[in-house]
């Protein structure tokens, strides 16, 4: 009988006993750790003599309500599987959900920038002023796809001169990119201040932080004392980090006629205005209730109107609001897509036209003058094989889009006479086909911000140009005809500068990475 195999029931019973004993042992150890004080270890003589490094400067964080602490039911005297235990678990889960929900509720109040200050230097008012590509791309870090040989082979003199000029842009020498951490989290959007006297960069991240960097600063030179650590002799750049939003800052704009005002749009459903002179931040637009969740995906302003905001949402909506009027009854909203609109832009010289890029794989051209609230009809649309991430208009009437089919598409509506179109003008499918298609790896994955083209608004020559991040850790510059002008890189770039922006008139280009760090070419 002793050699008989144990039945399945007996095996399960023994396994349950072993599991119970292990659990009781673990609970006993946990209880001992709660009530047993931990004595500090005494350092040996050699360790005690070691020079202590100065403690890092602590950044004052916003006070948060303490999260509910966990304690075992046994220590609380609650029997297992009892109604009290179930009620306790439900209360803990509800408290956690409420805490997470509170973090995401937007801040509707007006406040000074010191109220939303996170780290860095505090600001003062005078301190600032074809055919779709079928194959998927594979990123190869630091492998160039454009360089000096391409410039030498260029036969067009003007194009060759511009390629040489753009390729000679150099990384900011004061600090390497891996030292310039402008935001705590992944950069989602960036912009330059319009000023041509100094490069002033703004960056918004995934958690609602706003970073500000004055790149005209010079690296301080200091005489090292004998008792100073080596780290103290190499300070980081001076920058400022604020937190005006509770969720992702998706877009930002500074109107050239109001250079002291920065407008930011966020997934927390609000648009805020930051006054750089008065160092204040006020809410300019948001839904009536804080419980309304309408994440904003894009923001733009007409070149001839510094008072009207235009935006798009992840719900496929397009909105307009004149800040000089009461919000009640004056906000206009159109539903343009059943799926999210990832990006949009106004035609700078004729702002009643705008282009949208959507998850439904379309780039659509619209005319606000003929936009019906009930059934809005576009001027025309073009469908790609996969979703379209962004549609950017330039002053010549050309639109650049990026798409997950690994292509950049260029549409020349200026050549089709967009400036003279009458209200109600429409384009056929053939007229909406892109004039140029450029192969470009747009497979960003989960941890890299989506690649979006961005035009230089006022280029220094008649050749229009735009920049876009490159998955091989570069920033690419293209002309409106699809010719590559430069591939910018450099030492110290350890991640993809996915968010790339041009200064509106100077040949300054900035790139932001998933770690919140900045690259700057000038």
Curated annotation (Swiss-Prot):
Name of one Pfam family that matches: WD40
GO cellular component labels: nucleus
Residue runs in coiled coils: none
Stretches forming WD repeats: 182-223, 244-284, 294-331, 336-376, 381-422, 445-488, 491-522
GO-annotated molecular function: DNA binding
Superkingdom, taxonomy of origin: Eukaryota
Keyword S-adenosyl-L-methionine: no
Region feature (Disordered): 34-89, 217-239
Comp. bias intervals (Polar residues): 34-47
Record GO biological process: DNA damage response; regulation of DNA damage checkpoint
InterPro entries: WD40/YVTN_repeat-like_dom_sf, WD40_repeat_dom_sf, WD40_rpt, WD_repeat_DNA-damage-binding
Keyword set, alphabetical order: DNA damage, DNA-binding, Repeat, WD repeat
Segments of skewed composition (Basic residues): 49-59
Record bears the keyword Repeat: yes
Feature: compositional bias, Acidic residues: 226-236
Role of this protein: DNA-binding protein that binds to both single- and double-stranded DNA. Binds preferentially to UV-damaged DNA. May be involved in DNA-metabolic processes.
PANTHER family linked to this entry: WD REPEAT-CONTAINING PROTEIN 76 (PTHR14773:SF0)
Protein family (similarity comment): Belongs to the WD repeat DDB2/WDR76 family.
Protein name per the record: DNA damage-binding protein cmr1
Gene source species: Aspergillus oryzae (strain ATCC 42149 / RIB 40) (Yellow koji mold)
